[in-house]
UniProtKB/Swiss-Prot annotation:
Protein's name in the database: Large ribosomal subunit protein bL17
SUPFAM superfamilies: Prokaryotic ribosomal protein L17 (SSF64263)
Cellular component, GO, one term: cytosolic large ribosomal subunit
Single GO MF descriptor: structural constituent of ribosome
Taxon lineage: Bacteria, Pseudomonadati, Pseudomonadota, Betaproteobacteria, Burkholderiales
Keywords recorded for this protein, A-Z: Ribonucleoprotein, Ribosomal protein
Assembly and binders: Part of the 50S ribosomal subunit. Contacts protein L32.
Pfam families attached to this UniProt entry: Ribosomal_L17
Domain of life (superkingdom): Bacteria
Length: 131
């Protein structure tokens, strides 16, 4: 009897899962949008939402907790300097998961995960950044 039905194992060991979600959380904080499989995106919400809630109150203890979970200094700085203040008046629901169809090779359901209320990027700015 599986009381609670905790988390998706995603066919990985616990250390691999921890490292994968740590890397995905850093990527989401850095780029504010990522493309991944649907089960990973749904499980990543459980990792990233509490981190953004920590980022709303920039105490030293919260910064240390965030660094312990992310292990990336630049991501922690961005979390507390940009992302936390952006969601100061929002109580949860910081991410959006959009279904993107199925991957060509193995037909895995894909998803686009992004932070809500992220700044829009104009096409002209994107072209100048690419050059």
């Amino acid at each position: 009897m599986r009381h609670g039905n905790g988390l998706r194992k995603l066919n990985r060991t616990s250390s691999h899962r921890l490292a994968m979600f740590r890397n995905m959380a850093v990527s989401l904080i850095t780029h504010e949008a990522i493309k991944t499989t649907l089960p990973k995106a749904k499980e990543l919400r459980r990792v990233i939402e509490p981190l953004i809630t920590l980022g709303k109150e920039p105490t030293l203890a919260n910064k240390r907790l965030a660094f312990a979970r992310l292990r990336d200094r630049d991501a922690v700085v961005k979390l507390f300097a940009e992302i936390g203040p952006r969601y100061a008046n929002r109580n949860g629901g910081y991410t959006r998961v959009l279904k993107m169809g199925f991957r060509q090779g193995d037909n895995a359901p894909m998803a686009f995960m992004e932070l809500v209320d992220r700044p829009e990027v104009d096409a002209s700015e994107a072209d100048s950044d690419a050059e």
